[in-house]
């Protein structure tokens, strides 16, 4: 058991006293104090084990021994800034580039996803000579000022906030809840035409487009999977307008989607972005990130006459850790695990949808999966309070899951890549039980696929900054799961 010097309440008190109040924790009314972690599990101060279904930072598993060892050995030998020559920088850049199309060959190492996306904007502005950025509704790209401006997920939260005159918001390519849905004959073209319309409106105002930026699969926006062909069509419109395409892989890169190493590759081999940004999983918890672009764009950035330097970006310890992460992904076939376990998880959730009127949609690729809850399947009324109830009750079962999307009603699975079939069964079994309890409490009826909206749970709408709603104090009903599991999984 890990040794902690403070009891939980003392830690909470000191955090309130010394840490900014806008820096929130999960489950704000009763946060979990985590003292150690290993693989896909996290442990509190009582050494109670939680299944981590949301931590895409610990990509190859919490505290993976190969990653820990690589960082420790390099730290004992050398850690300095990138103005000194050292092999790990160039070897790591070479390994990263080998996972990408040949055109993407030049790396800039930085320290966070926000730094990476901010630098990507600078590259776009310099290369095109234009100023305006197109972003997607509900997108999130980072917390620095330039990125809050292009993150509707954030600026929509601020009363009266409007995007800057140089930022244009296109429709999110959401085929479940968006303007063009799964019954549309060609949603990719329809959503891409919206981007073209945004460009034309900008031109009417005398504005020129520098870049279109999008997460390869929207995460905070609700696990949105763009329709096939969408990126190709958007890139054509944007490039015709003199702009470039930035693929934000901070959330979904490094094999998480299973079939491919990068999320943008789901669109097909004929699509190559002009800039790719990566972060979060790249260092398995170590702060590092990267921007990779073409030689042409890099030379344009150099032509400004301003040197680019980042004190910690590409330091020897970060590069050693990054190399270790790539080695573990390959050695343990974690991309293959994401494909097979993710497919199994998706199938279990699809089975839930057949039995539970609260489940509106299941969508995802690999170990990036969303379960959207609704009060009415035909109207797709968001079940926001119910989604929060689920994640709080899962916490009581020692399963960590979050809800996101514009209505905070999408349960998000993005666990460490060592997540197993047994973990998937355990999590879905508990969700099955909780949904059954909630549906009983709501006194729902199910004529065909529709459910009544009149009986939803009465509760205070006490959303906190994490998008979590404090749960009711009602007791759960006892329930025997009917989910067809290959075997029941017991947890300590």
Swiss-Prot record:
<dbReference type="Pfam" id="PF00202">
    <property type="entry name" value="Aminotran_3"/>
</dbReference>
<dbReference type="GO" id="GO:0008483">
    <property type="term" value="F:transaminase activity"/>
</dbReference>
<dbReference type="GO" id="GO:0035162">
    <property type="term" value="P:embryonic hemopoiesis"/>
</dbReference>
<keyword id="KW-0496">Mitochondrion</keyword>
<dbReference type="GO" id="GO:0050459">
    <property type="term" value="F:ethanolamine-phosphate phospho-lyase activity"/>
</dbReference>
<keyword id="KW-0456">Lyase</keyword>
<feature type="region of interest" description="Disordered">
    <location>
        <begin position="462"/>
        <end position="492"/>
    </location>
</feature>
<dbReference type="InterPro" id="IPR015421">
    <property type="entry name" value="PyrdxlP-dep_Trfase_major"/>
</dbReference>
<dbReference type="InterPro" id="IPR005814">
    <property type="entry name" value="Aminotrans_3"/>
</dbReference>
<feature type="modified residue" description="N6-(pyridoxal phosphate)lysine">
    <location>
        <position position="280"/>
    </location>
</feature>
<protein>
    <recommendedName>
        <fullName>Ethanolamine-phosphate phospho-lyase</fullName>
        <ecNumber>4.2.3.2</ecNumber>
    </recommendedName>
</protein>
<comment type="subunit">
    <text>Homotetramer.</text>
</comment>
<dbReference type="InterPro" id="IPR049704">
    <property type="entry name" value="Aminotrans_3_PPA_site"/>
</dbReference>
<dbReference type="GO" id="GO:0030170">
    <property type="term" value="F:pyridoxal phosphate binding"/>
</dbReference>
<dbReference type="GO" id="GO:0005739">
    <property type="term" value="C:mitochondrion"/>
</dbReference>
<keyword id="KW-0663">Pyridoxal phosphate</keyword>
<comment type="function">
    <text>Catalyzes the pyridoxal-phosphate-dependent breakdown of phosphoethanolamine, converting it to ammonia, inorganic phosphate and acetaldehyde.</text>
</comment>
<dbReference type="InterPro" id="IPR015422">
    <property type="entry name" value="PyrdxlP-dep_Trfase_small"/>
</dbReference>
<dbReference type="InterPro" id="IPR015424">
    <property type="entry name" value="PyrdxlP-dep_Trfase"/>
</dbReference>
<comment type="similarity">
    <text>Belongs to the class-III pyridoxal-phosphate-dependent aminotransferase family.</text>
</comment>
């Amino acid at each position: 058991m890990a040794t902690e010097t403070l009891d939980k309440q003392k830690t909470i008190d000191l955090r309130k006293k010394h840490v900014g109040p806008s820096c929130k924790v999960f489950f704000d009314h009763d946060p979990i104090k985590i003292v150690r972690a290993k693989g896909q599990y996290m442990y509190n101060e009582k050494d109670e084990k939680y299944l981590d279904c949301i931590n895409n930072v610990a990509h190859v598993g919490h505290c993976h021994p190969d990653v820990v060892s690589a960082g420790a050995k390099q730290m004992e030998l050398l850690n300095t800034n990138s103005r000194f020559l050292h092999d790990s920088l160039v070897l790591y850049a070479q390994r990263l580039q080998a996972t990408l199309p040949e055109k993407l060959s030049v790396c800039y190492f930085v320290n966070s996803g926000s730094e990476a996306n901010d630098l990507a904007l600078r590259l776009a502005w310099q290369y095109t000579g234009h100023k305006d950025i197109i972003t997607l509704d509900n997108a999130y790209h980072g917390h620095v000022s330039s990125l809050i401006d292009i993150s509707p997920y954030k600026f929509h939260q601020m009363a009266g906030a409007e995007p800057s005159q140089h930022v244009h918001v296109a429709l999110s390519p959401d085929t479940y809840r968006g303007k063009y849905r799964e019954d549309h004959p060609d949603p990719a073209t329809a959503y891409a035409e919206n981007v073209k319309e945004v460009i034309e409106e900008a031109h009417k105002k005398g504005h020129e487009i520098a870049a279109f930026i999008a997460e390869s699969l929207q995460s905070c926006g609700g696990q949105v999977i763009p329709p096939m062909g969408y990126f190709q069509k958007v890139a054509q419109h944007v490039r015709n307008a003199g702009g470039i395409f930035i693929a934000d892989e901070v959330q979904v890169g490094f094999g998480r989607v299973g079939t491919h190493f990068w999320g943008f590759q789901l669109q097909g081999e004929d699509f190559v972005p002009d800039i790719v940004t990566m972060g979060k999983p790249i260092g398995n918890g170590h702060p590092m990130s990267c921007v990779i672009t073409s030689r042409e764009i890099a030379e344009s950035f150099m032509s400004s006459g301003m040197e680019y330097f980042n004190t910690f970006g590409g330091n020897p310890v970060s590069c050693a850790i990054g190399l270790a992460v790539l080695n573990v992904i390959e050695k343990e076939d974690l991309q293959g695990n994401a494909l097979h376990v993710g497919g199994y998880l998706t199938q279990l959730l699809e089975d839930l949808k057949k039995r539970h009127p609260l489940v509106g949609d299941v969508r995802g690729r690999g170990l990036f999966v969303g379960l959207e809850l609704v009060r009415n399947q035909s109207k797709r009324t968001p079940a926001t309070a119910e989604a929060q109830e689920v994640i709080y009750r899962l916490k009581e079962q020692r399963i960590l899951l979050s809800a996101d999307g514009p209505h905070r009603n999408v349960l998000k699975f993005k666990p460490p890549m060592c997540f197993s079939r047994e973990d998937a069964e355990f999590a879905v079994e508990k969700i099955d039980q909780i949904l059954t309890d909630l549906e009983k409490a709501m006194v729902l009826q199910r004529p065909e696929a529709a459910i009544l909206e009149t009986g939803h749970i009465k509760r205070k709408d006490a959303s906190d900054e994490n998008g979590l709603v404090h749960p009711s104090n009602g007791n759960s009903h006892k329930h025997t799961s009917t989910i067809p599991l290959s075997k029941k999984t017991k947890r300590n």
